[in-house]
Amino acid sequence: MIILGVESSCDETAAAVVEDGSRVLSDVVASQAALHGPYGGVVPELASRKHVEAILPVLGEAMHEAGVTWGQVDAIAATQGPGLVGALLVGLSAAKALAYALKKPMVAVNHLEGHIQAAFLGREELTRPFVCLVVSGGHTALYRVDPDGTTSFLGSTRDDAAGEAFDKVAKLLALGYPGGVEIERLAAGGDPHAFNFPRAFIDGRSLEFSFSGLKTSVATFVRQHGPPSESGEQGAYRLADLLASFQEAVVEVLVNKTVRAAGMCSVGDIAVVGGVAANLRLRERFEEEAGMHRFELHLPARRYCTDNAVMIAAAAYRTWKRSGFCLDPVDLDARSRWF
């Protein structure tokens, strides 16, 4: 079965053609990072306008790269939510139009379920339950996922998502957007134990997250100590040490709570997905914990951590296997909140 997937929930316009939920025939992503960089974050109105410009070229390129005709496509899939509603509408409307015009069945995909599916691309689906950490610029949440696809919410952030905290600290220090990539690069040369930043809800059984206090703590430190230096001369602090310490605080909380959730749910498998799952320090710490606690760790390839349409097409295939497609795409509408 060949599925054309479409993704436009935030600031990437993406399309992909995937066969049988795992064989990637094409994978096209048009990033808007340069557009939003001067603002230090995504501007929703600009994002939706850019999606309008990019959607048809991206769809055409995906079909050309896949080497298939429209007649060979068995179904259309698109992200329905959650995300920026104006951005979602562009990809969803394009997919609905294609499904209607070509008389193809369609499935609407939950963006977070797409991320979860990214951890198992090219692999067999788990036949046992697992705990999944979804961690990105817009989401930081824990779920229990059962073999039949049932997803149970375990806990999420009370304020900022982890990726949002990375972006806000990067903006504070004028590091550019997206901030996570630059912070990771600079933190690699720093001491993660140089500064003891707060870890919210780190003790006890809570599965909730909070990163606003950590972000504020970094801002307060910079305000009190002034700008960093490159080498730390004359008692000044190094930027690399500051960023490494901030990153370590985020990573410790994410790892601690995810492992705790797995223990509370009595499961032996953990998946970590979403844009922040591309962070090498986070992956390293989870791998260390997997070795210590003997759980099976499932990580997407780094290129599939950020938003893409491969995961949407793959998730649609799994949905079809479970319950079939939505045969009337006309009634589908974007959902800014879902789960």
UniProtKB/Swiss-Prot annotation:
Subcellular localization, as worded in the UniProt entry: Cytoplasm
Pfam families: TsaD (PF00814)
GO terms of biological process kind: tRNA threonylcarbamoyladenosine modification
GO cellular component, one term: cytoplasm
Enzyme class at the top of the EC tree: transferase
Primary residence: cytoplasm
Gene3D superfamilies, A to Z: 3.30.420.40
Residue sites binding Fe cation per the record: 111, 115, 307
Keyword Manganese: no
Alphabetical list of PROSITE patterns matching this protein: GLYCOPROTEASE
Molecular function GO terms recorded: iron ion binding; N(6)-L-threonylcarbamoyladenine synthase activity
UniProt-annotated binding residues for substrate: 134-138, 167, 180, 279
Record InterPro entries: ATPase_NBD (IPR043129), Gcp-like_dom (IPR000905), KAE1/TsaD (IPR017861), Peptidase_M22_CS (IPR017860), TsaD (IPR022450)
Cofactor binding note: Binds 1 Fe(2+) ion per subunit.
PANTHER family: TRNA N6-ADENOSINE THREONYLCARBAMOYLTRANSFERASE, TRNA N6-ADENOSINE THREONYLCARBAMOYLTRANSFERASE, MITOCHONDRIAL
Protein name per its UniProtKB record: tRNA N6-adenosine threonylcarbamoyltransferase
